[in-house]
């Protein structure tokens, strides 16, 4: 069986934050949805990464793993697993997709246009992955990845887009992303801001500097009209 530290590409002395960063990077790289032409290998790698993260991110499981030795860990280990270990043959690991969703706060990171979508004819922005090819796993936990772009929209109108993403130190609960897009529509300056934080999506639309609509998780909020 593979050494879980080697699977995540970290040292046996890696900190919990190192484990999170490694999982974030590899899970995004090997998620089956990102590898449609190599799905079988991707599923295998994704499962390995998930199992490694499940064990090494839990201090108790990691301690048992370190004491038992990676070569005697679970998956048919039977008698090779120490009697004191709660993990025997056929240990029920969690569904890799459940771990992935939980890590990203219930959000689908591949749905964000700025994640790694290049410019298209509609003026969508380069993704953060394009700016930082190594992926989020290389980021310090407190660091923001910023990208700002300008392009021409249809009909010669201008459009600018700004996006940012940041991760706190607690994995999913520390995730926040902001995407702001401004374009001219019929002579009016329309700015749309999309904020995703702690599993909640908020979309604000401004027209010539005045807030026109607010939508939270797909439901439009009533706006107060000042007389």
From Swiss-Prot:
One of its GO terms (molecular function) is unfolded protein binding. It holds the Pfam family DnaJ. InterPro entries: DnaJ_domain, DnaJ_domain_CS, DNJB2/6-like, J_dom_sf. One of its GO terms (cellular component) is cytosol. Keywords: Chaperone. Residues 3-69 form the J domain. One of its GO terms (biological process) is chaperone-mediated protein folding. PROSITE patterns: DNAJ_1, DNAJ_2. The keyword Chaperone applies. Interacts with histone deacetylases HDAC4, HDAC6, and SIRT2, HDAC activity is required for antiaggregation. Efficient suppressor of aggregation and toxicity of disease-associated polyglutamine proteins. The antiaggregation activity resides in the serine-rich region and the C-terminus. This is DnaJ homolog subfamily B member 8. The gene is Dnajb8.
